[in-house]
Curated annotation (Swiss-Prot):
One Pfam family it belongs to: OmpA_membrane
Signal peptide per UniProt: 1-22
Source organism (scientific name): Rickettsia akari (strain Hartford)
A GO cellular component entry from the record: cell outer membrane
Keywords of this entry: Signal
Lineage: Bacteria, Pseudomonadati, Pseudomonadota, Alphaproteobacteria, Rickettsiales
Protein name from the UniProt record: Putative adhesin A1C_06425
């Protein structure tokens, strides 16, 4: 938690410096909200070696930012996901569960605070194309469920990771001071904590799941 607060403070300081510069330039600042659909990369469960697939999850971000230059802006966003899971059913291939039919589910809770920068690549009359990148702390934990293996299900505690985001999108002005966005982002949130669970006298390693996702989002920016 201390690490999260330290990184958050650093991110806020960097954004504050950008804001001060933007104020000197007489530029505006904005609020933003984004939501859409996302899917995690395929992963493998450590305890059973069952290969997991993602359902469709809903990413949500709220943020505040400034226009630093005419074609460059920066913002600070707080984001999370709703309803995401990695899951699958199959036959375990990892001892001591080899041959056991099991249904595995990893349900993550992810909260990230990112400082982002965006550059407009082109400026057309009706829309702009932009690219961006972001970095910041993410709190990641998960609930792990095994149906078919009694006593193995568990929860991991929060782990603070460094999260990264790469973005490519387009924006268009829809009203005075209001822009709509459509963007694709790849986000890496790191791994959850690993946990040893005692199963019938044997220590079994669970958790340690890696979360990276492909996101398609729509958003609104309001000048304030």
């Amino acid at each position: 938690m201390k690490k999260l607060l330290l990184i958050a403070t650093t991110s806020a300081t960097i954004l504050s410096s950008s804001i001060s510069f933007a104020d000197d330039m007489g530029n505006e600042w904005y609020l933003r909200v984004d939501a859409g659909a996302a899917m995690f990369n395929k992963e493998q469960d450590k305890a059973t070696s069952v290969k997991l697939k993602s359902n469709t999850t809903v990413p949500v971000d709220l943020g505040i930012g400034y226009y630093i230059f005419e074609n460059f802006r920066a913002d600070l966003t707080l984001g999370t996901i709703i309803g995401g899971k990695l899951k699958a059913s199959g036959s375990a291939t990892h001892a001591p569960f080899t041959g056991t039919n099991v249904s595995v589910s990893h349900k993550p809770t992810i909260t990230r605070l990112l400082i982002n920068g965006y550059v407009d690549l082109t400026n057309f009359d009706l829309f702009d194309v932009f690219a961006g990148a972001g970095v910041g702390p993410a709190l990641v934990k998960e609930k792990i469920t095994y149906n078919g293996i009694t006593g193995l299900s568990s929860n991991t505690k929060n782990r603070t990771n460094i999260s990264y985001r790469l973005t490519l999108g387009t924006s268009a002005q829809i009203a005075d001071g209001v822009k709509a966005e459509l963007a694709y982002s790849w986000i890496y949130d790191g791994r959850t904590k690993s946990k040893n669970v005692i199963y019938q006298g044997t220590s079994v390693l669970t958790g340690g799941m890696r979360y990276q996702s492909h996101n398609l989002t729509a958003g609104i920016r309001f000048d304030i």
